[in-house]
Amino acid sequence: MKKNAFYAQSGGVTSVINATAAAVIQEAKKFPNQINKVYAGQNGILGALRENLIDTSKESKKLIESLYYRPGGVFGSCRYKLKSLDENAKEYKRLIEVFKAHDIGYFFYNGGNDSADTAYKVSQISKSLGYDLTCIAIPKTVDNDLAVTDTCPGFGSVAKYVAISTQEASLDVQSMMESSTKVFILEVMGRHAGWIA
């Protein structure tokens, strides 16, 4: 039976998160017998909780294609970690309520470890409530620390950016070191992982 899909962005934005959004929207159109519309959550999962859904079918093909080259998070992202099912069943039930209201049968959550955990929890609550929902976590993290994932989209971009920035900073230090500083400290992202450094 044909259902709608819900896509949301989570965590820090990378130069690949919008490309992933474009791919989800375009690929969904290749399955018209299974997926009707793709809704995007305004500001991530908060968009579902607040019922702020963007109907991507109203956007032009040209605009969706432009997402491949657009930085930032076009639909808005969030750092909102849903608590455990035991601690906050109300929020999970709210998600399912919104999904039912918009006939959503597919949930794509684009982010890191917390997003994958949320997709898993939503799949568990949907099963327990008897609601047929396919939940898919889409990896995206510059941290490159997702379990059983070799390389995350986002990591290659940041690795290149940090390498180039370090080279450029070294030229600055080199040109000033005779009469000025000889030390340069570069702090990079990566949370508890050190892949970027």
What is the meaning of each model-derived region?
Residues 37, 123-152, 159-164:
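Short, acidic/small-residue loops that bind anionic groups at enzyme active sites
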Residues 1-53:
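N-terminal phosphate-binding or glycine-rich loops at protein starts, especially the Walker A/P-loop
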Residues 51-105, 114-115, 142, 154, ...:
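Glycine-rich oxoanion-binding loops at beta->alpha junctions
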Residues 20-24, 113-133:
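Short Gly/Thr/Asp-enriched flexible loops that form oxyanion-binding sites at enzyme active sites
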Residues 10-12, 41-46, 79-80, 112-113, ...:
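Short, ordered loop/turn segments at secondary-structure junctions
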Residues 1, 6, 30-33, 65-69, ...:
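Solvent-exposed alpha-helices and their adjacent loops that cap or buttress functional pockets
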Residues 177-197:
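Conserved anion/nucleotide-ligand pocket segment
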Residues 4-14, 74-79, 105-111, 137, ...:
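Short glycine-rich or small-residue beta-strand-to-loop segments that form or flank ligand, phosphate
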